[in-house]
C-alpha cells in the first residue's frame, strides 16, 4: 500500500531512479511481484495443510451446498436474520458506475440475468459487499457428535445471492479484494499548516488508486476483466488465492474452545537483564553507561513505556519520534 504504490508512481510519472541494487522502479516491481506471488502460494499451501489436519481433531471447514437438509435450514434462518439485513447490493450499469470499494474490503461481483419475453437473457452486474460487522467464520450447530463444522460468510452470501435479486437468476460470481494506494503525499516545505495538510492527505488516501486485486475460488475471466477495467489494473496486478481471502479471520478462530492441545503455551515477556538490578534508576542514566537493546515481544514493552514517561518529564528531552506499535493486551 505504501512502498509498491510509491514505485508505481515513479513508473507512471516516468521517473527513473535506481536503488542500492541498481534496480529502477519497473525492475523492483517485477521482483516484488515474483516474491509476493511465491509467498502467497506458500501461505495458501501451509494454511490448507493446517485446515486438513484440523479435521483429525473434528474441525471441518465446508461449503453451504455440502450441508445436510437440517443444517441448511438452520443456515437459511441465520442468513435471513443476521446477514441479509446488513448487505446492500450495489448495481453496476449505465446509470450506476462501478462503486468505490474501500481498501481491503471483501466483495463479491455477481452476474445476474432475467429471462425476456423472447426467451433471451438480459444480463446485469452487481456488487455484494461482504459486511465486516459479522464474523467471517460461522459455526453450524452440532449434530450431536464431536464434529465442529464451519462455513465462511462470503460463501453463505454467494450461496443465497438470489435472495438479493428477486426475479433474477445467478449466472456466476467472483469474490475479490482491492488493495489501494495508502501513501501520504505531504510537502512539508510548502505546507503552511502541517496538521491541515496531514488531515487532507488522509482524506485523499481513503480514495487512493488500486494497486492490487486478489481473487479466489473459481475465477470467471469475464468478471475478472470487468473488475480490472473498472479499477484500472492489469493482469499482472492480480493475485489468485487458493482458498479464502484475508487470513486474519483465523486469528479469532485460534481462540475457539477445544483447541487447547493445539495451542502453544502462553509466553510471558521478560524484563531485559540489564534492568533487573536497576529498579528505580532512570533509564537515561542506564543508557548513558551502555546501549540497551529491547527485543519485543520476547522482552517487555513496559520498558518502552517507562522510557516515554521519563522523557515526558525530562527537561533535556527535545522531541520524541514514534513509528508504530502493536496493540497490547
Identify what each model region corresponds to.
Residues 1-319:
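N-terminal non-catalytic structural scaffold regions of very large proteins
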Residues 322, 327-329:
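Single conserved hydrophobic/aromatic residue that forms the stacking wall/gate
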